Amino acid sequence: MCRTLAAFPTTCLERAKEFKTRLGIFLHKSELGCDTGSTGKFEWGSKHSKENRNFSEDVLGWRESFDLLLSSKNGVAAFHAFLKTEFSEENLEFWLACEEFKKIRSATKLASRAHQIFEEFICSEAPKEVNIDHETHELTRMNLQTATATCFDAAQGKTRTLMEKDSYPRFLKSPAYRDLAAQASAASATLSSCSLDEPSHT
């Protein structure tokens, strides 16, 4: 059974609080709109040591692969915050919008949302125009004539590759993530130590 943080020694609580604060500072500017499948707020397990340990493992897992980062709500929020510092958050927001788009089952809603995404991210002088080649741009434009769940696949793939090869390595090397990963390692070790040191109750 998970032990509550309230039962941990003060030093353990302070370490967990410090880690949470550091992550909060790192993410506080990350605001993903509902149209992109909102995942902008980090989730900190404040009640159970197991949740906090899993959270630390989540942070450390972001450096294992880009897929793991994108599959983590906290990872997406952290990566989005980093991209905002580079003024390139539109790539991730477009990718997320495409992921949500694929879940639409109504043909009418699909067509309407397809045009919204195109106007926001693809068309010339779009407010959040992504950097894709002319061929992909034209292919996507043609796909909108008969919108399907896959009409943005080519453009989404291009932006994903760009993020994975360009932005993702810089994110991992950023002082913010390296410091966060160090804190995650320390927090994980501390929580493990506290769990072992906590007196048993009978």
Swiss-Prot record:
<protein>
    <recommendedName>
        <fullName>Regulator of G-protein signaling 16</fullName>
    </recommendedName>
</protein>
<dbReference type="GO" id="GO:0007186">
    <property type="term" value="P:G protein-coupled receptor signaling pathway"/>
</dbReference>
<dbReference type="GO" id="GO:0005886">
    <property type="term" value="C:plasma membrane"/>
</dbReference>
<dbReference type="GO" id="GO:0005516">
    <property type="term" value="F:calmodulin binding"/>
</dbReference>
<feature type="lipid moiety-binding region" description="S-palmitoyl cysteine">
    <location>
        <position position="2"/>
    </location>
</feature>
<comment type="subunit">
    <text>Interacts with GNAI1 and GNAQ. Interacts with GNAI2, GNAI3 and GNAO1.</text>
</comment>
<feature type="modified residue" description="Phosphotyrosine; by EGFR">
    <location>
        <position position="168"/>
    </location>
</feature>
<keyword id="KW-0449">Lipoprotein</keyword>
<dbReference type="GO" id="GO:0016020">
    <property type="term" value="C:membrane"/>
</dbReference>
<dbReference type="InterPro" id="IPR024066">
    <property type="entry name" value="RGS_subdom1/3"/>
</dbReference>
<dbReference type="InterPro" id="IPR036305">
    <property type="entry name" value="RGS_sf"/>
</dbReference>
<feature type="domain" description="RGS">
    <location>
        <begin position="65"/>
        <end position="181"/>
    </location>
</feature>
<keyword id="KW-0343">GTPase activation</keyword>
<comment type="function">
    <text>Regulates G protein-coupled receptor signaling cascades. Inhibits signal transduction by increasing the GTPase activity of G protein alpha subunits, thereby driving them into their inactive GDP-bound form. Plays an important role in the phototransduction cascade by regulating the lifetime and effective concentration of activated transducin alpha. May regulate extra and intracellular mitogenic signals.</text>
</comment>
<dbReference type="GO" id="GO:0003924">
    <property type="term" value="F:GTPase activity"/>
</dbReference>
<dbReference type="GO" id="GO:0005737">
    <property type="term" value="C:cytoplasm"/>
</dbReference>
<dbReference type="GO" id="GO:0007601">
    <property type="term" value="P:visual perception"/>
</dbReference>
<keyword id="KW-0564">Palmitate</keyword>
<feature type="lipid moiety-binding region" description="S-palmitoyl cysteine">
    <location>
        <position position="12"/>
    </location>
</feature>
<dbReference type="InterPro" id="IPR044926">
    <property type="entry name" value="RGS_subdomain_2"/>
</dbReference>
<dbReference type="GO" id="GO:0009968">
    <property type="term" value="P:negative regulation of signal transduction"/>
</dbReference>
<feature type="modified residue" description="Phosphotyrosine">
    <location>
        <position position="177"/>
    </location>
</feature>
<dbReference type="GO" id="GO:0008277">
    <property type="term" value="P:regulation of G protein-coupled receptor signaling pathway"/>
</dbReference>
<dbReference type="GO" id="GO:0005096">
    <property type="term" value="F:GTPase activator activity"/>
</dbReference>
<keyword id="KW-0734">Signal transduction inhibitor</keyword>
<keyword id="KW-0597">Phosphoprotein</keyword>
<dbReference type="GO" id="GO:0043547">
    <property type="term" value="P:positive regulation of GTPase activity"/>
</dbReference>
<keyword id="KW-0472">Membrane</keyword>
<dbReference type="Pfam" id="PF00615">
    <property type="entry name" value="RGS"/>
</dbReference>
<dbReference type="InterPro" id="IPR016137">
    <property type="entry name" value="RGS"/>
</dbReference>
